[in-house]
A protein has these predicted regions:
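Switch II (G3) loop of P-loop NTPases
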Residues: 1
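Conserved GTP-binding G-domain of TRAFAC-class P-loop NTPases and closely related GTPase folds
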Residues: 8-12, 17-25, 29-173
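Alpha-helix C-terminal capping/helix-to-coil transition sites in glycosyltransferase folds
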Residues: 4-5
């Protein structure tokens, strides 16, 4: 019932931990001559592609909530939060979270945008710690306090914002 009556859903996705087979297909195409010579190599299939896994999860949730897909969803709003955004290798100061999401999970992106109204879905980039913690940065992190280090990037923006509640404000705004 909480899902059905919610104003919005926030879904956190850590892109670096998601299995995406497009890269493996590219590797197979690039290395096909070497693979032909060594028939003992097989493609790894150690998990379901993230696009498929997330789409299936959304389909289950939409079914449980009895949200019909004959028309686009206006409620609940959907905020996709790309967590550990500072660790995403292809994020730059000129790319937006939306662009990263479209590139990394294209099938899921199409599924969500075909089911939600355009202004009822948003993609955010979140770094709750502001950096990856290692031996050197850990002490600096503790000295400066965690409350001063995180940031979020709003959809279609490049600038970091210290207000981590921005997606919640968007959902209720």
């Amino acid at each position: 019932e909480s899902l059905i009556n919610a104003n919005g859903w926030m879904v956190f996705i850590r892109l670096n931990d998601e299995t995406k087979y497009k890269h493996k297909i590219e590797d197979l195409l690039t290395n096909r001559d070497a693979i032909k010579k060594d028939n003992s190599k097989q493609a790894e299939t150690d998990g379901v592609d993230a696009n498929i896994w997330w789409i299936e999860l959304f389909q289950i949730v939409l079914h449980v909530c009895n949200l019909k897909r004959s028309q686009r969803i206006s409620k609940p709003k959907l905020a996709i939060i790309l967590s550990c955004y500072d660790q995403i290798s292809n994020s730059t100061s000129t790319t937006t979270p939306k662009e990263i999401f479209e590139k990394e999970l294209p099938l899921l992106n199409q599924f969500l945008h075909s089911n939600w109204e355009k202004d009822k879905i948003s993609i955010w980039g979140l770094s709750s710690l502001g950096r990856a913690l290692d031996g050197r940065s850990q002490n600096n992190f503790v000295d400066n306090g965690p409350e001063n280090q995180g940031w979020i990037i709003a959809p279609d923006h490049h600038e970091k914002n210290a207000d981590l509640t921005s997606p919640i404000v968007w959902i209720y705004g």
